[in-house]
Amino acid sequence: MNKARVKMVLLALLVFLVLIQIFQPARTNPSVIPSRSMAAHVPVPADVYTALTRSCGDCHSSQTHWPWYSHIAPLSWVITDDVNEGRRHMNFDDWEALADQKVANDRLIDICEEVKQKGMPPFSYRILHRDLRLKAQEIISLCAWSQSFRTSPPGIGFSPSHP
């Protein structure tokens, strides 16, 4: 490939990258209603709450901290999709969305397996946010708390009609 062709390809790529910035996804942080939150329905020890909000809250809450690179396409598309998927699966700030008590209980139990197997937080998040990685003691605390729901009746502490 000659130099002129390389320059043309690079220019076309640059123009493409600039043009795709027009198509930005909606990065939202819905209003938080405390009575709908997980903490209003499930007893959460302070150390577990701290670990969950710090290491999981960007995708599993309505209080996402959108970093600068989440405003640059195509990364913005991927990050927004990850956050929306995380919120759909389990949103700590909209616990009442898990209207089925068994589903809510199962999600709590699954937390331990996800963090032990390093499925959560995802690898890409852990790489970019080294300071937000779960520490060994936090994983132990999360698992002890999460697994306590195995012996509790489904939906313990969960009440869809909670005020």
Predicted segments — roles?
Residues 8-24:
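Hydrophobic membrane-insertion alpha-helices, especially the h-region
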Residues 29-33, 115, 153:
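A charge-rich, low-complexity, intrinsically flexible signal that marks solvent-exposed coils, linkers
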Residues 31-52:
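Electrostatic cytochrome c docking/interface patches
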Residues 52-64, 120, 142:
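The canonical Cys-X-X-Cys-His
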Residues 66-81:
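Acidic helix-start/capping segments at beta-turn-to-alpha-helix junctions
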Residues 77-128:
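Extracytoplasmic electron-transfer domains, predominantly the class I c-type cytochrome c fold
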Residues 117-120, 126-157:
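C-terminal capping alpha-helices of c-type cytochrome domains
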